[in-house]
Amino acid sequence: MAEVAAVAARRRRSWASLVLVFLGVCLGITLAVDRSNFKTCEESSFCKRQRSIRPGLSPYRALLDSLQLGPDSLTVHLNHEVTKVLLVLELQGLQKNMTRIRIDELEPRRPRYRVPDVLVADPPIARLSVSGRDDNSVELTMAEGPYKIILTARPFRLDLLEDRSLLLSVNARGLLEFEHQRAPRVSQGSKDPAEGDGAQPEETPRDGDKPEETQGKAEKDEPGAWEETFKTHSDSKPYGPMSVGLDFSLPGMEHVYGIPEHADNLRLKVTEGGEPYRLYNLDVFQYELYNPMALYGSVPVLLAHNPHRDLGIFWLNAAETWVDISSNTAGKTLFGKMMDYLQGSGETPQTDVRWMSETGIIDVFLLLGPSISDVFRQYASLTGTQALPPLFSLGYHQSRWNYRDEADVLEVDQGFDEHNLPCDVIWLDIEHADGKRYFTWDPSRFPQPRTMLERLASKRRKLVAIVDPHIKVDSGYRVHDELRNLGLYVKTRDGSDYEGWCWPGSAGYPDFTNPTMRAWWANMFSYDNYEGSAPNLFVWNDMNEPSVFNGPEVTMLKDAQHYGGWEHRDVHNIYGLYVHMATADGLRQRSGGMERPFVLARAFFAGSQRFGAVWTGDNTAEWDHLKISIPMCLSLGLVGLSFCGADVGGFFKNPEPELLVRWYQMGAYQPFFRAHAHLDTGRRGPWLLPSQHNDIIRDALGQRYSLLPFWYTLFYQAHREGIPIMRPLWVQYPQDVTTFSIDDQYLLGDALLVHPVSDSGAHGVQVYLPGQGEVWYDIQSYQKHHGPQTLYLPVTLSSIPVFQRGGTIVPRWMRVRRSSECMKDDPITLFVALSPQGTAEGELFLDDGHTFNYETRQEFLLRRFLFSGNTLVSSSADPEGHFETPIWIERVVIIGAGKPAAVVLQTKGSPESRLSFQHDPETSVLVLRKPGINVASDWSIHLR
C-alpha cells in the first residue's frame, strides 16, 4: 500500500509540474506579469479607433423634429452628418435624483446587447417636461428636484444643471462615436491586418472642424474592424465594428474614484498620454502595481467628488471597456442659451471622462447626489446592496493551495485549538477534487468528506471547497456528460462545444448567461447531487473571468457563442457575475431558501455585491502588495462591493515573519479576512512562527473576534442602505481636502480609524486624524487626540494603530472563543467614546446569524444607543424587528468621562438600581460593571 501511495504521489507531483510548465509557456511566467500577453489600447483595434478621434465639434446632430415626449421618457433621433446613419437617444428622469441616457441604432442590422440581470428592478420614473425651446435647443425639467437638462441639437450635446449650476455635460468634447453596423466591404479581402500596424484611422472631425466639412469624405473600415489577430489568436468579427464611446465633462471636479479593479491608488489618475484604465475581467498572473491594466473584475462606476458635491456615472456595458481621464480648465460660460443658467465668470477646474466599449449600446446612469451618501443609495437602488453574510464568514479563514487530505485538514483544525487561536473556516483548493472534477472528492485523499465535515461542525467550524466554472472534458464524468447532452456549454463560432485549457486539462465552459444553465448549476449544490457535502460546506468560485490558459489574454475567444446568439465579446464582463449568482442560488436552494449562502468569487461586475464576497486575487508576499490592498478594497467598497479582502501573507512567495504579522494586523481590520498561499510556499499556520510572532497574531485575531458585533452591524447597515463598510476618509469628511487622496488609512463605519503599518522595520506612522472640533481615542491606551491633525505615532511590532472617534459607541464581545458560533450568545460590552460635547451614539444588529429569518419573519434586533446629558439610553431603532436572545449587557466602558457620584440603572417596570463602577482619572475611563440587562430591552443608565 505504501508503494501504491508513493506512486500516486509522484504522479500528482508530475501533473502539478506539467501544469506549471504549461503555465510558464502560456503565460510567460516571470517574477512579474508579462505585459505582452495583455493588450494595450493601441493593440485593441476598437480602443485605437475610438481614441484616434480627437476633441472637436461632434458630427452628430439631434433632429428636434423627431422629438417625442412620453410619460416615461423622451426620444429624439441623432443624425451622423457624414454617414447619415440615425441613432435614437432616450432620456429618462428617474426618482432619487438620477438620469438615464440610452443611445442605440435606430434601425440596426442586428439587435445590440443590452445588459440584463444587473438592475434589481426598472427604476421608477421622474417625468420630464419641456420648459423651453428654440431652433437649436430644448430645455427639459425633471419632476423631482431643481434639475434641468439642456439638449442642444447641433452639435449634439446634453448639459445637466441644478438650478443655474452646471453639474455635467455629455458630448461637450464631441467624442460620441457609435460604430454602426454595416455589410462587409468586398474590396477589403477576407482578412484585415493585425492590430497595431500603424494604419491611419478613418477621417473624423478634429479640433476646429465643422461637421459640414466632413461631408463627402469616404467612410473607411479600419484594420481590425472585421477580423484581428493578437499573438497567435484570431478573432473573427462577423458583425464588424460595433464599438461605442461617449465623453462626460465634470466642471468643478478634480478628484474621481472607482472603476475597479485596478492595482492602483484610490484617486484615479489622468490617463492622457498613457494607457486608459481598462475594464476586462482577466486572470493576470503576478499582477503589477500602480498601473491601469485590467484585473479580475470590472465595475463600470465612476464617482466624482469636491467639497460641495458628489456625482456618479454608471456605464452599463458588459463588453471590454476603456476609460480615459483628463484634467482640464473649463470656462463657466457656455454658448447660446446656457449663459442664462450659469453664475459667475472665469475658469474652474474640470475632469473629463471618456468611456469606450467594444459592443453594446450606450446605457448610462447619472447619479446626481448631491452627497456621497446619496450617490451610494442611488447606485444601490439600481444594482442592489451588499448581501448580509452569515456571521461565521466575518471570522478568520485559513486556506492554502492545498491541504493534502482529511488528516491534514483535521490537523490544521486541531492546531488552532492547541494554540488557542480562533478560526471559523478551513479551505480546500483544486487538489481536493478527483482529478479536478468539481463536485467530487479525491477518493484516496478525501474518502469520507462528510465525516470530516461533521468533525469540523462539532467544533462549530465550516469548510469551503473550490468549484471552478470549467469542467473537465471526460466521458463518464457526470457533470460533463450532462452539460454536453443538454447543450449547456459555450459554443464556438461554428456551433461545436467550446473547449479550452485549464486546471483539469481540456475543459468545457458552462454558458452561465443561459438561465437554464444557472438553474442546472444551482441544483448541483443540493446534498443529493454534491455527494459528501453538508450544511457547513460553502463554496469558492475561482477562475470565473473566465480563465482559459490557452486563450487570448488567458481568457475566452471573443467570437465564442452564448445563449441568445450573443458573442462572448458582448457578455465577457458579466460572465463572472452569473457564476457567482448561480452558486449563491444553489446554496440558498439546498436549504429550502432558509440559509444565507457564503460564496467567494474572483471575477465580478456591477451587482455582484448581491451574491457574496470578492478578493484582490493572486497577490505577492511583498510590502507593496500589503499597501495596495487598502486602495483596492476601498475602491470596491465605493461601488457597492463591501465584502472585500486580500490574501493575508500574499499568495506568491514566502513572507518574512514581520510582513506576515503586519498582514494579519491589517487583515483583522478588513471586511474579508483570509490567509491563503500558493502550492509552492511554506506552511503558514500561525503557530509555526516563533512564539513572539505567534502571540502578536493571536492578539490580532482576538481584536477581530472581539469586534464581530460591530462588523456584523456594519454589514447590516451596508445591506440596508448601500453604504460602504471600509471607507475612505473623505466619505465621512467630504469638505476636508486633505482626505481626498489619502489611501493608506481608512474608516470602518463612522467609528474606527485604522492606519495599518505597511513598511518594513517601521518605528512610527503618520496618522491623519480628521474632523474640526472632533476627538479620537487610541483604542489601546485611550489617549485622546484632537482633530484635525497629522500625528506621528510610534509603533512596535505589536502595534495596530486604531482610533475610535469621539461621539460613537462600539459593541464588542470580550470572550474570544474557538469560532464565532461559540461566541454568538456571549454578553456585550459597549465602548462609549464621548465627543467634546459629551455625546455618543451607535447601533447593534443581532439575529440568528445564518438564516433569512431577519428578512422573511422580521426576526432581528436593531438597537440604538444614545449618550447625552450624562445618560445612556437603549431603544429600538426598528420597531418592526423582534428577536429573543439571551445576550445581556455585561459592561459599559465610557471613554472621556469624569467620575460620577453614583450610577443608576432604570428599566421599565423595575425600580432604580445602583451600578458599581470604576474610574481611572489618568485615562478618563469610566467602567460600569454588570448592568445585567437583556440587550433587547429598553433601559437607561444615569451618571449622577
Curated annotation (Swiss-Prot):
This protein's source sits in the domain of life called Eukaryota
Q: Which residues bind substrate?
A: D283, D429, R602, H676
Compartments where found: Endoplasmic reticulum; Golgi apparatus; Melanosome
One Gene Ontology term from the biological process aspect of the record: N-glycan processing
Q: Which reaction does it catalyse?
A: N(4)-(alpha-D-Glc-(1->3)-alpha-D-Man-(1->2)-alpha-D-Man-(1->2)-alpha-D-Man-(1->3)-[alpha-D-Man-(1->2)-alpha-D-Man-(1->3)-[alpha-D-Man-(1->2)-alpha-D-Man-(1->6)]-alpha-D-Man-(1->6)]-beta-D-Man-(1->4)-beta-D-GlcNAc-(1->4)-beta-D-GlcNAc)-L-asparaginyl-[protein] + H2O = N(4)-(alpha-D-Man-(1->2)-alpha-D-Man-(1->2)-alpha-D-Man-(1->3)-[alpha-D-Man-(1->2)-alpha-D-Man-(1->3)-[alpha-D-Man-(1->2)-alpha-D-Man-(1->6)]-alpha-D-Man-(1->6)]-beta-D-Man-(1->4)-beta-D-GlcNAc-(1->4)-beta-D-GlcNAc)-L-asparaginyl-[protein] (N-glucan mannose isomer 9A1,2,3B1,2,3) + beta-D-glucose; N(4)-(alpha-D-Glc-(1->3)-alpha-D-Glc-(1->3)-alpha-D-Man-(1->2)-alpha-D-Man-(1->2)-alpha-D-Man-(1->3)-[alpha-D-Man-(1->2)-alpha-D-Man-(1->3)-[alpha-D-Man-(1->2)-alpha-D-Man-(1->6)]-alpha-D-Man-(1->6)]-beta-D-Man-(1->4)-beta-D-GlcNAc-(1->4)-beta-D-GlcNAc)-L-asparaginyl-[protein] + H2O = N(4)-(alpha-D-Glc-(1->3)-alpha-D-Man-(1->2)-alpha-D-Man-(1->2)-alpha-D-Man-(1->3)-[alpha-D-Man-(1->2)-alpha-D-Man-(1->3)-[alpha-D-Man-(1->2)-alpha-D-Man-(1->6)]-alpha-D-Man-(1->6)]-beta-D-Man-(1->4)-beta-D-GlcNAc-(1->4)-beta-D-GlcNAc)-L-asparaginyl-[protein] + beta-D-glucose
EC main class here is: hydrolase
Instruction: Return the EC number.
Output: 3.2.1.207
Could you list this entry's UniProt keywords, alphabetically sorted: Disulfide bond, Endoplasmic reticulum, Glycoprotein, Glycosidase, Golgi apparatus, Hydrolase, Phosphoprotein, Signal
Give me the ranges of the annotated region Disordered: 181-238
Q: Where is the composition biased (Basic and acidic residues)?
A: 203-236
UniProt lists the family membership as follows: Belongs to the glycosyl hydrolase 31 family.
Write down what this protein is called: Neutral alpha-glucosidase AB
Name its species. Macaca fascicularis
